[in-house]
Amino acid sequence: MAKQVQNFNAEIKQLLDIVIHSLYSHKEIFLRELLSNASDAIDKLKFNSLTHPSLLPENWQPAIRLEPNSETKTLKIIDNGIGMTQEEVVEFIGTIARSGAKAFMQMNAEMKTKPELIGQFGVGFYSAFMVADRVTLHTQKAGSNDGTVWESMGDGTYSLDSVPRPEGTGTTITLHMKDFKEEDEVQNFTDKWVLKSLVKKYSDFIAHPIKMMGETEEETLNSQKALWLKSPSEVTKEEYKEFYQHLTHDWNEPLRTVHYRAEGTMEFNALLYVPGKKPWNYNMRDMEYGLSLYIKRVFIMADCKDLLPPYLRFVKGLVDSSDLSLNVSRELLQQDRQVTQIRKNVTNKALSTLKDLLTKERSAYEDFWTEFGATLKEGLPSDAANKEKLQDLLLFHSTSSDKMTTMDEYVARMKETQKDIYYITGDSLSQVSNSPYLEKLKEKGFEVLLLVDPVDEWVVDALSEFKGKKLQSIMREGLDLDTAEEKQQKEQEKKQAEVTLKPVLESMKKTLESDVKDVVLSDRLTNTPACLVASSADPSAHMQKLMAQMGKEYAGQQVKRIMEINPNHPVFEKMLKASPEQQTKWAEILYAQALLTEGSNLPDPVKFSQQIAELMVQAADSTKH
């Protein structure tokens, strides 16, 4: 095939412009990115060769080589990994269909101050243009005799040519270095001492040897330390941090490091990290998660989901097992009893680590909770076996103070007359903390949990009770706040109010029969005229709202709620004297107000605003007389 010249798509041009012109500092990270890609290519070849042994060349020994040449001002990074077909070269280098590269460009402002983040976005190859004005890539896919040469000057075009690679399978990247001025303070990346120090700094933990010719013979520059096989006492904090950064491309420090060896019926080594911050793509649909799996130090796969439950997807790290078969596949993993045992063990270790953090470093745990609490809560509805451990890790806002509380702390503060653990759900703290549903509970001094994560609706359903105390929504019917003596005292008052307000109750029931199940007197309101509550068997209004956002309807229709009215509010005394037409309008206004109070949308906002305007005019007219 004759040599072709093609244009990068518009987004690649934009990305290259950012890399070439915006990332002024830390130009040295290009080497880390290219070495990491080379290591991944070798890992992929090793993994594919488990099922296709013929892919491996005879006497194959994995290695990455650096060949600097100060005379020609070039640096070659050579690997004998899986290589690429021409189609893959175009897909991975010439276009930008991946979300990571798009996200990289969206975060351009942050990239100017933190260029080391580039690897998180899967576009580390382009960092070569930070130091080179021409990049040549020569690659050949394992199992193929066809090679591809890709070349670009970062100017918006690239060339493609079909040329067999003399070395066979693998990839060679040749960087034709830029001429930097002395004031740019850029290191000489064709200097062997500089390259040695950069490999030590960024890539010492890469599992494959990184080689370069010394004075008389080829030298291995990296230690290839399998940190997880060492005793924890032999590993420094700095080494743990460096390995975490190598593994995750997260250049913050991990919040917690867990390094242990499991022995007994199932033996394996594990090195786990709890991050301090969410990665950029956390919870995106295409986000990969899971631990890296090694078997007898042989890399098998990254992002092995079977080693962790989804609610611990923020945990990073690896497991190295001596007992699993090297021929294991992703499909077989799901059915492997030993993998199930590893998952159980790793889950227990992760949860006990978080419990330890909560107990000993509350402030750090609260920071963790801000980042990953909503994810951890997903375990309550999905992992019954670990329900007790998970419920002890929960933190919630409450009416007690600005500080978050555990369930244990809440129970310890409960008043003697308080029967249940009370909670309210909603969209935001400001909404629920000012809710009229709290009126009676504040009056009695009862603490209420303020639940504002969407997952909380499923959490309270799964939890139902804690240490013998029932969880009770204050937005449901049957809220029992009074003692036996208080009930007895109020019973006569309630009966009298039902008689007095019977015309209002009947009028409202008739007006709102298509909107509510019933209209009854309320025990929970002190200042607000009315509210809506869910019956015990129905979903809350907030749950219905969430289901609608997910594109699901509950039982195919909006579920009616019960309207409670405050018999002591003066509006109902006025309604008793109002005409039937006025009672109808006021009932509609009270229902609309109750919808707003619970955080629901109005079915007819225009009608509501007109009714409020009419009331204002009537109020103004009455003051004239």
Curated annotation (Swiss-Prot):
Chief localization: cytoplasm
InterPro entries with a match to the protein in the record: HATPase_C_sf (IPR036890), Heat_shock_protein_90_CS (IPR019805), HSP90_C (IPR037196), Hsp90_fam (IPR001404), Hsp90_N (IPR020575), Ribosomal_Su5_D2-typ_SF (IPR020568)
Subcellular location: Cytoplasm
Location of the region described as B in the Swiss-Prot/TrEMBL record: 331-545
GO CC aspect terms: cytoplasm
A as annotated region, ranges: 1-330
Xref: Gene3D superfamilies: 3.30.230.80, 3.40.50.11260, Heat shock protein 90, C-terminal domain, Histidine kinase-like ATPase, C-terminal domain
One Pfam family this sequence matches: HSP90
Location of the region described as C in the Swiss-Prot/TrEMBL record: 546-625
Annotated keywords: ATP-binding, Chaperone, Cytoplasm, Nucleotide-binding, Stress response
GO function terms (MF aspect): ATP binding; ATP hydrolysis activity; ATP-dependent protein folding chaperone; unfolded protein binding
Parts of the chain that traverse the membrane: none
Domain of life of the organism encoding this protein: Bacteria
Keyword Nucleotide-binding: yes
HAMAP family linked to this entry: HSP90 (MF_00505)
Subunit structure: Homodimer.
Entries under PANTHER family matching the protein: HEAT SHOCK PROTEIN 90 FAMILY MEMBER
Function: Molecular chaperone. Has ATPase activity.
Family listed: Belongs to the heat shock protein 90 family.
Listed name of the protein: Chaperone protein HtpG
Source organism (scientific name): Bdellovibrio bacteriovorus (strain ATCC 15356 / DSM 50701 / NCIMB 9529 / HD100)
Gene: htpG
